[in-house]
Amino acid sequence: MAESHLQSSLITASQFFEIWLHFDADGSGYLEGKELQNLIQELQQARKKAGLELSPEMKTFVDQYGQRDDGKIGIVELAHVLPTEENFLLLFRCQQLKSCEEFMKTWRKYDTDHSGFIETEELKNFLKDLLEKANKTVDDTKLAEYTDLMLKLFDSNNDGKLELTEMARLLPVQENFLLKFQGVKMCGKEFNKAFELYDQDGNGYIDENELDALLKDLCEKNKQDLDINNIPTYKKSIMALSDGGKLYRTDLALILSAGDN
């Protein structure tokens, strides 16, 4: 199935989903190591078997990752390599997904109740807005298909809604600073203790200066995961979740809390 899709001159959204599932063997949401090398090998073989040249995007991709053991790509990168249908591809090229800060602002717009989740209807509106900003419209059937596929692609725990970290897979890997914070998340008890420690004036929220102090300490303790030189970027992106400069516990928990365990 994947071979025939890789030979197509135009890959539909549902075919793209099937290709992704085929190669993301461990369901991590990323292709790396053997998964990535399998993709490169099968892509080259499929195109050759069909008598097709690699497209310029495919050649660049093979040159960049073919000889690397440490390569890692997400859904966004693959969507740019394969000849994916235009409207679906636009979802990965929109301005709101060019940087983590813009992504956080977009998240805040749609997670209106600060629940930490975007549910099906909210996701549908989010995708509709992205396409409209690119001056594209799709009918309700196609929009429902895209919404369903996005849930299948990103909803790793199959609860029918997307958490911030799941939704962030719409970002290119190099832009997704949330990946860095996966290794430094705290259990609920530790997070609450840290929040109260850095909420120095006890007003129930953390401001930019308090966040700066928290990030500096986190970087010092987790040098393998976090780069202290990137604090301005981390801070800008996290503060995009704030309410007028006030970063409440539930907002910061999206980044730093791993839950109650």
From Swiss-Prot:
Ca(2+) 1 binds at D24, D26, S28, Y30, E35. One of its GO terms (molecular function) is zinc ion binding. One of its GO terms (biological process) is short-term memory. Keywords: Acetylation, Calcium, Metal-binding, Repeat, Vitamin D. It holds the Pfam family EF-hand_7. InterPro entries: Calbindin_Ca-bind, Calbindin_six-EFh_dom, EF-hand-dom_pair, EF_Hand_1_Ca_BS, EF_hand_dom. Residues 2-7 are annotated as: Interaction with RANBP9. SMART domains: EFh. Ca(2+) 2 binds at D111, D113, S115, E122. The modification N-acetylalanine is found at A2. One of its GO terms (cellular component) is neuronal cell body. Ca(2+) 3 binds at D155, N157, D159, K161, E166. The keyword Metal-binding applies. The keyword Oxidoreductase does not apply. Residues 11-46, 53-88, 98-133, 142-177, 186-221, 226-251 form the EF-hand domain. Gene3D superfamilies: EF-hand. Ca(2+) 4 binds at D199, D201, N203, Y205, E210. Interacts with RANBP9. Belongs to the calbindin family. Buffers cytosolic calcium. May stimulate a membrane Ca(2+)-ATPase and a 3',5'-cyclic nucleotide phosphodiesterase. This protein has four functional calcium-binding sites; potential sites II and VI have lost affinity for calcium. This is Calbindin. It comes from Bos taurus. The lineage of its organism: Eukaryota, Metazoa, Chordata, Craniata, Vertebrata. The gene is CALB1.
